[in-house]
Amino acid sequence: MKTNYLLILFALLLAIPQAADAKKQKDIAIHLYSVRDLINNGTALHVVLKNLAQMGYTSIEAANYDNGKFYGKTPEEFKNAVEKAGMKVLSSHCSRGLSDKEVASGDFSESLKWWDQSIAAHKAAGMKYIVNPGIGVPKTMKEMKMYCDYFNEIGKRCQQNGMKFGYHNHAHEFQKVENQAVMLDYMIENTNPEYVFFQMDVYWIVRGQHSPVDYFNKYPGRFTVLHIKDDKEIGDSGMVGFDAIFRNAKVAGVKHIVAEIEGYSCPVEESVKKSLDYLLDAPFVKASYSK
């Protein structure tokens, strides 16, 4: 009897760390802009990716697309590097603004040629989402309407290639264009949900003196991907209100969360690890939002 008791106790002790590890397995992507200093200072990409995977990040969002390549690598090479490190390719920030000539003429067909090439490269890299990282405040309502039409067309082409297109906000989108319409609201209301989603950067919404949850309720289902960001390390400032954000993720339509650490109070490696640990330990952050 005593032997059986000891065996059971030993089995329970073995299960404790496994259970703890299981609790900390969450689908959390990282925006590679967060580690730009490491990459720009010459640290090999495969080393950076491996370290991120070992920390517990499960996928990446690229931030360095240029002329058919990601961080100097072909789409296939980049995809292989990410997967070899033990992560998945999720999304990429990529943009081409309209020229003054295109705005004046109302014809953005030339830019769409660029997008066709970019979409092909992103598809080859295994991307699920392409996100425009932001545009400036349009000078006129006509220009803003044109950008919505432009984004709808890009989104349609992404959809035809098995991807989705989104727009990432900052705080300036709360400005009114020609004193008529709030830029962010107008863009959400004048883009087709079938073609365009919004990657809400929760930090910039708060910095713009608005509530992410209010926007979730105002435009339910439009925020497929969230950028989880803070002033520096995630969770440190106390200003963003992550608890309420995550508890209302369902109404927002969230499928993925992407950590972005733009500023640091410690070395980059420590900063991105500390930010991830906050999300892994937070009871209000689910293991996955895509299921």
Regions found by a protein language model. Give the residues of each.
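Active-site acidic/histidine proton-transfer and metal-coordination neighborhood
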Residues: 100-197, 269, 289
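Positively charged n-region of N-terminal signal peptides that target proteins for export
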Residues: 1-5
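Bacterial N-terminal signal peptides
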Residues: 7-15
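N-terminal pre-domain/capping segments
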Residues: 7, 20-128, 277, 281-291
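Aromatic-rich peripheral "rim/lid" segments of glycoside hydrolase catalytic domains that contact
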Residues: 237, 248-249, 254, 262-291
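Hydrophobic faces of well-ordered beta-strands that scaffold small-molecule active sites
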Residues: 26-31, 60-62, 89-94, 130-132, ...
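Acidic/histidine-rich catalytic cores of soluble enzymes
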Residues: 59-60, 159-246
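Acidic-and-aromatic substrate-binding clefts and catalytic sites of carbohydrate-active enzymes
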Residues: 36-42, 62-74, 96-112, 136-145, ...
